[in-house]
Amino acid sequence: KWDMIYIPSGTVHAIEEGLKLIEVQQSSDVTYRIYDWGRDREMHIEKSLDVIDYDGKNKGGKIENFKKLETPYFTVEKIDVKDSYKDLVDKNFHSYTVINGTGVISDGNSVIDLNKEETVYIKEGVNYSIKGNLELIKSYV
């Protein structure tokens, strides 16, 4: 169905063709490429070698029965909505990606449809409710 895999910074990784993923990360303009599968983009071999976590200090991997991951930079949660779910964005923003099902999100003034593989962002200070039968990935800082 789906897996939650935490890949900490400094971990060399690749994404297989045809794979769908949600990539939650600390905001950064830096991506170091050590191989690019035949694409003609800049490589960063030396810089990559300087930041690789060779000792595996930053533990990552598949998270069985995933419900919540908290890092110093972001939090990711799996939210199962069976009828309704209410929340408040007390700081920054909330992001939801629908991984299964359909529903709607409303702040009392507007309603947005939520469909599989769609993402919605909710700004700070908004009280909102989600209605439907959905599995969501919620991300926030």
What are these regions (language model features)?
Residues 4-6, 12, 21-23, 76-78, ...:
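Conserved hydrophobic/aromatic beta-strand scaffold that supports enzyme active sites
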Residues 10-31, 124-141:
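Ligand-binding loop in jelly-roll beta-barrel domains
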Residues 81-108:
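Glycine- and acidic-residue-biased ligand/ion/polar-headgroup-sensing regions
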